[in-house]
Amino acid sequence: MKKKFGLAGLVVLMVMLALGAAAEEGNTIIIGCDMYAPYTYKNGTGEFVGVDVDFATEAFGRLGYAVQFREIVWENKQSYLDSGEIDCLWSCFTMSGREDEYTWAGPYLYSRQVAMVRADSDYTELSQLAGKRAAVQASSTAEKALLRRENPNVPEMKQVLCFSTLGEAAAALRKNYVDMVVAHEYAVHSLVDTLPDLYREIPQTLYANELGIAFGKGTHEALAARLQTAIDAMREDGTAKAIVEKYGFDAEKSLGGGN
């Protein structure tokens, strides 16, 4: 009995170690993401595409890894990391304000948070939205920013409604349940470009963000460091610039942090 128990315990330990070291030793990195165009989304054939998909494929490829993107419930992202179902998060994920919560590689891109309103509304400035209703993605930095109001550019809202996805937040705006949606600028650009008769961007910055790749806190430090080296090389050799420009980004601002 003792021998059987010892063997079972050893098997459990080996499985746990394998899960924790999967990213370091395996050939495929499992990346958690949500649908957040133009960063991570699916094309007409159901394949993951986007800035982050191209970035991750190239960066991890230089390290000898293939990548597999997996759509997750974004507000439950921590549980996916803790369980080992995914190796990291790479989906327009903000480092700013979360520096001590994960093991990071990055920043690989810079972004701004902006407001989107209905195309038929009269709003032209952020100040006009004070006392109104806002929609954000749950567990996002936009949610925290609107509720805490630590940035003077952020107006005080009457109500902040949180949704599981940006698409749901945009639908709430379309149905006039809220007065604005706050999200990353190029995600807003994508929605406005796709549905210009429905949405319009307020051309002011609420606050700036740094975007990074998040591994579980205290895990995969060596891999994160190697990934950072690959990202730095992509900046130097022009690959990063080619990727962001492919999706219509301003390379100087997105890669250099300019506003």
Where are the model-predicted features located?
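Extracytoplasmic small-molecule ligand-binding "clamshell" domains
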Residues: 24-93, 162, 226, 246
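Beta->alpha turn/N-cap motifs
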Residues: 32-37, 70-75, 84-96, 119, ...
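Acidic, polar ligand-binding/catalytic clefts
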Residues: 57, 61, 66-128, 199-205
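Extended ligand-binding regions for polar small-molecule ligands
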Residues: 53-62, 123, 127-128, 132-133, ...
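Periplasmic-binding protein-like
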Residues: 34-35, 110-117, 185, 189-229, ...
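A ligand-binding cleft/hinge motif common to bilobed small-molecule-binding domains
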Residues: 76-79, 92-101, 145-148, 172-207
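A conserved helix-loop-strand patch within extracytoplasmic ligand-binding domains
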Residues: 65, 106-158, 218-220
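Ligand-binding cleft/hinge of the Venus flytrap
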Residues: 56-65, 142-163, 190-196, 245
